[in-house]
Amino acid sequence: MGLQALSGVAKDLTKMSAKSAVKLVVAEDEDATLFKWVAILTGSKNTLKGVGFFLGGALLTWLGYEVALYGMAGAVALSFVAVLLLMTGDLGKAKEKVKFSVILTKSPAINILSGARFFLFGARDIWFVVGLPLFLASQLNWNHTQIGSYMAAWVIGYGLVQSISPQIANHNANAGSARLWLLALIVLTGVMSGSIYLDFQPALTVLTGLIIFGFIFALNSSIHSYLILVYSDRDKVALNVGFYYMANAGGRLAGTLISGLAYQFGGILFCLLTALGFLIASWLIALALPHSDTGLIPRKQENSG
């Protein structure tokens, strides 16, 4: 368990560093290019995560646990060597040390976006992490393989949507579009809750609703990932992104814990209603995001980048 925890910390540090680097290698006035590469990086990461579910199962089946671990360690070692050879050592290094408290006192936009992110990801995991698998097993009689395959396929699709989110969102990523897609999630989750409460095709509601939820959620997540870079100074981008992902991790932890409790109290319906509350909280926080032209990306600019 300790090694698993350290692995998770290393993964988040790698994710934070990679997204911070995008801000540093893209010119400051190339908003469309920044959105495009953030979307590609975020989407490919989640798509590979979904593929990893399938590969993990295959490696366990074909090679066994110990050999599978050696194989993964070898792949990570090759990546480490590539980073040492190809990446400059001063990329993203701050000019001066910054105290943690500075983020809270001098970055209101980042604080607000991080708060919205906390409740957004908490809302997803409240019904996705524990409630959904239990619903599929107890109500639809799915086995472990079916549940794992469905959720892995969902993660892959989610990542693919993130990768092309600039085209889907018409190259429009700003605080207003973030609030709009959040509102769409609120409406969808409310409709799903009502359908299940009325016992109207609950299985179809959950399976179809999850696909639509993933599509909208992927767009919202990509816009958030873009906005955190827009709101960050180049010199402190890694620090700001790290704080933002701390909120992301906190939301996921809260969502995971609440998911099991909510399902025990009232099944998938109570999970959805609790998620709905988190989405509303995220939307209310997002109302305070700065109103500006930042993030309005002309379509023609993307082609020139």
Give the ranges of each region predicted by the language model.
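Short amphipathic helix-loop junctions that connect adjacent transmembrane helices
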Residues: V130-I147
